[in-house]
Amino acid sequence: GQTNPVDDGPVSFAALLRLVSATPGLMRLRFTTSNPKDLSDDLMRCFAELENLCPQFHLPVQSGSDRILSLMNRKYTVAEYLQKVEALRTYRPDIALTTDMIIGFPGETDEDFEATMQLLETVRFHGSFSFKYSDRPGTRAAFFDNPVDEQVKSQRLSRFQKRQDEISLERNAEYMDRVL
């Protein structure tokens, strides 16, 4: 599961990436995602070291509010997330970052949502997968008794996605007249 630690065993994932990267004739190497709490400096350093590692990374944040992240049991804060973003961009300045965002988690206030919008402005993701919260049976959140009104969730999601689309368009324009 997403909130369970990864046991890399005797070989770390970063070491495995380095081994795979050295495969003769391998022009492009991509891995998709990591939970921010499990993203090591060694793994981030691979983006600087491995020429064939694609400069794109999906780093799901879920919310820009520490309070909501705690309710989600995410095990990291917005500040810790931003440190990962800064490190990735230091190691690979041209890295394209994408994320996941859940809008309308139970108890999400206007202030929590505005914190999410602020994170969007700060990071300026190249893209995001964003959705309205919906109950999942068997999760702690399914038992929370303070749901966000569906109309409010829809309005917030629309606002978030509209701004993300604008940022994505600006980000995509940066690739004009470039060979990638």
Predicted regions and their residues:
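Short capping/connector residues at structural and topological boundaries
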Residues: H58, N73-T77, G138, D149, ...
